[in-house]
Amino acid sequence: QAAKVTEIVTARKFVELGSLEPLIEELSERFEIIYLEDVREKLSLKDKLAGGLGPVFPFLFKAATPYKKTGVVLFTSGTEGDPKGVVLSHENVMANVEQVRAHIELFPDKDVLFNPLPTFHCFGLTVGAVLPIVAGIKTIFHPTPLQPKEIAKRIKSTQSTILLATDTFISQYARAGDQGDLNSLRLSVCGAERVRDETRQLVRKKNNIEILEGYGATEASPVVAANAVG
């Protein structure tokens, strides 16, 4: 209501994992529910050609985007009161992406970013979704961060090199994974909460992973500062 939303885009798999069927049924009385599975089925040949040729000929398919216009409305986690809707422009998000790129050395031909964090939070959206697209990095999305064993196995099978996480989640993944499951990771970018010394020691000793800890806020798109690796 605060963002004047009229449509909700989701996926049946996400609804199933979260046992959100009753909520979706209630919301469907006020909003149009769009399932990504249905969108995929309705893609025309023209849509598929545009999607395939777009990366090769970007200037032919690029839509003009006013950078000052609203790009996204994200709601804060509510740690200091009721959640607030934060309006971010395209320029806000893209500027923060470039700032992060200037701080983290990325290798498009080698790096694989693993993002289990939700994109309805700014960290998961800016760093976990927009950044790898702009940087040309292969990205693996996982529908929920609450599956430590499955995530550890999937990191191994995809040979991911960068993990997005929080202190709580990366310590769970390190403990839940078998020896060697996280060995492909060279870096974990952590935010949302302070990284404890014991977490750094755990992942460094068990998996030889360096943690890049960031500080930020949704209003800042979200990264404000980050430590240097090493």
PLM segments and residue spans:
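Conserved AMP-binding/adenylation subdomain of ANL enzymes
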Residues: 94-112, 120-162, 176
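Short acidic loop-to-helix transition motifs that present clustered carboxylates
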Residues: 1, 145-150, 170-171, 195-196, ...
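Conserved structural elements of the adenylate-forming
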Residues: 51-58, 67, 86-106, 116, ...
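Conserved pre-ATP/AMP-binding loop-to-beta segment of ANL
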Residues: 33-75, 82, 105-112
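Short, structured coil segments at secondary-structure junctions
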Residues: 3-4, 26-29, 135, 183-184, ...
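Short beta-strand->loop structural element characteristic of the AMP-binding/adenylate-forming
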Residues: 1-9, 32-36, 85-87, 115, ...
